[in-house]
């Protein structure tokens, strides 16, 4: 079993963006994937019908954050520590690129940005394989990530958006009292 956390993003109407559905597709391609979707703030209707096991809400991003995402990084680090997933997936967006890299650094995990393919079975072989552009996009290279969790950002459009529906359990991850590390 490969446990995966997909970090969701919202559009201007508050609904799940297409790249989140693409990340769910990528996660579901992993063998025996157990997928959780994490979203800041309350879960919108589009999240509560995703074909995943659970949707976890964390604190909303404060308007004073100004694109730094310290709170989201701290909250996700606490969730990753509690859940011990094999893979954490983000969209390669401003949010995903910043928080993914910060999360990897904070927890001492491997970071694979801008991936166009993901494979492997973290529970059996202990590795996740990713394919990503190198040399300014002139070539693709395959990498194996042997540490867990692997923090991955996925290139938008590299996967078809998942259109299946489900009825995931929706739960809240309480981070009140969480000690936040200074910048």
What are the functions of these language-model segments?
Residues 1-183:
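N-terminal glycine-rich FAD/FM-binding segment characteristic of electron-transfer flavoproteins
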